[in-house]
């Protein structure tokens, strides 16, 4: 039987906590997956210094290639920055990608000076505050306070993320795989315009935009995470079944 696997991609300054509930929805169905740390993550904020979007894409692409040695088709699941990378991979590997789940993808930013950041980043060094309340912006604030995301990061790394959003947006019309776009109206990091831009510009005929109202940016762990994960699981199982049925008929 033809096999399908999933590549799970975390966000900017993020940790495995942000996406580690996804595998629990895959393993009962014997779905192989990869969940790599992208360059500069999972260690110290300073390790993002000098890292650019080219590194994040290269790491995700390496994991994609590794997974492809095990499976016939890949479903990409990405949160925030990981959503950008997932869309980029879908545009680059159209014949190998079965579907895309784009969760709160960082195609736009609430930060009103994001477009000016590239001018001041070299002078700013690290952004953020080690003492900031990590529960701010979460519906489930206690879970947010226990989250392991970086509290600060090198300003140039954010500038690279901002530039990456522009790069990926140009690639959206090349995406042909079915896509599920998930976003929260309460996201204080990425505005709803990001999800709307992806939905409007993506080349996929089979596309769905799913909204939530009791989640912050970290949708795979916040207040509505069970429902978000249900949607992810349903998308994966539906498209796996359809693919296996079509290949069986052949």
Regions found by a protein language model. Name each.
Residues 175, 181-183, 187:
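Short beta-strand/loop motif that positions the catalytic acidic residue
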Residues 213-250:
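Catalytic active-site module of serine/aspartate enzymes centered on a nucleophile-bearing elbow/loop
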Residues 188-194:
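Conserved alpha/beta-hydrolase "acid-adjacent" motif
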Residues 78-82, 86:
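Gly/Ala-rich beta-loop-alpha elbow adjacent to hydrolase catalytic centers
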Residues 28-45:
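Conserved alpha/beta-hydrolase
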Residues 101-111:
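Active-site nucleophile loop of the alpha/beta-hydrolase fold
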Residues 196, 200-218:
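Catalytic histidine neighborhood in serine/cysteine hydrolases
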Residues 13-24:
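The serine-hydrolase catalytic nucleophile loop
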């Amino acid at each position: 039987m033809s096999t399908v696997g999933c590549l799970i991609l975390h966000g900017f300054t993020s940790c495995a906590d942000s996406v580690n509930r996804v595998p629990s929805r895959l393993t009962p169905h014997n779905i192989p997956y990869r969940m790599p740390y992208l360059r500069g993550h999972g260690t110290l904020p300073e390790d993002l210094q000098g890292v650019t979007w080219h590194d994040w894409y290269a790491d995700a692409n390496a994991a994609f290639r590794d997974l492809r040695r095990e499976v016939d088709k890949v479903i990409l699941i990405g949160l925030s920055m990981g959503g950008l990378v997932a869309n980029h991979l879908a545009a680059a590997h159209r014949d190998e990608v079965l579907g895309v789940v784009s969760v709160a993808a960082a195609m736009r930013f609430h930060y009103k000076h994001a477009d000016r950041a590239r001018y001041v980043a070299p002078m700013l060094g690290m952004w953020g505050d080690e003492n900031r309340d990590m529960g701010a912006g979460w519906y489930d604030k206690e879970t947010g306070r226990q989250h392991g995301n970086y509290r600060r990061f090198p300003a140039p790394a954010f500038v690279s993320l901002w530039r990456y959003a522009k790069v990926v947006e140009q690639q959206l019309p090349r995406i042909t795989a079915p896509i599920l776009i998930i976003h929260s109206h309460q996201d204080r990091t990425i505005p709803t315009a990001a999800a709307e831009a992806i939905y409007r510009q993506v080349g996929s005929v089979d596309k769905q935009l799913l909204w939530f109202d009791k989640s912050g940016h970290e949708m795979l762990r916040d207040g509505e995470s069970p429902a978000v994960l249900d949607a992810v699981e349903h998308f994966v199982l539906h498209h796996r079944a359809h693919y296996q049925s079509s290949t069986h008929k052949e």
